[in-house]
Amino acid sequence: MSKSNRVAGNRLYFGDNLDWLQRIESDSVDLVYLDPPFNSNATYNILFRSPVAEDASSQIAAFDDTWTWENGAERALDHVRKLSLDTFVLLDALRRTFLKEGDVMAYLAMMAPRLLEMRRVMKPTATLYLHCDPSNSHYLKMLLDCVFEGQGYINEISWKRTTAKSDYAQGATHYPRVRDVLLVYRKDTTTAATFNQQFAAYDEAYIAKKYGLKDPDGRAYQLDNITGPGGAAKGNPSYEVMGVTRYWRYSREKMNDLISKGLIVQPRPGAVPRFKRYLDTMPGVTVSDDWGDISAINSQAKER
């Protein structure tokens, strides 16, 4: 690829993402997030104008998220054959069996070359997040498994919507559809990648139950167990602390350091000492793969 055809960083590129992906150098991208059309058979308003005057009228028109085999899917599948024979074989099998040349098959054929190019441009440490909905997430997950050669899967995140879609009313024959899906893949799971663990604040009921003790200055804490589970079999040392001999989870040196800092306390004479764990030293609740408490971004939010 000539330098004149390569894309530069920190720019917003307009047009078909496949065209631009093909201009990005291999192993150069740290993070990929895509929120592609979901094959929802819905119509959406375009939020941008074409920089080319003669294209403006067509670009302003509503985007129709309905896929048909006649709309370039055959060419896309031929492109996949050149990029990855395994991925082509998978899609061809779906086409020949139950998906035929329907809308879902067309959707997958159009997604496949883009996902293959995304994997190519990702660094070994890069991660990909694909945002979709449950209507086709199972097909996309199978496609991603093939694109990443069966080794890149990390998580499937369920993201609860703030409101249910308007597909549920009295007399409905299905459960309300209230979630989206984030499929998370890493290019090389054997290579250390950047991952910043996320935490959410504790709710008030949890704080009241677990951190009901307070210092004179109002600093909340709880008294936590410091005995070593498994005893000697787990390598925990045994010695005396405040007149009590147990197997402890800390070395004697570490225990003495905590005592000097006032973090090891004895609730009453003869009781097993405990660790004074302050609420303000805790990061919060670990964010899992079930996102149900993320507020919507309104027009005044700083993320705008």
Regions found by a protein language model. Give the residues of each.
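Class I S-adenosyl-L-methionine
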Residues: 2-24, 28-30, 38-142, 146-304
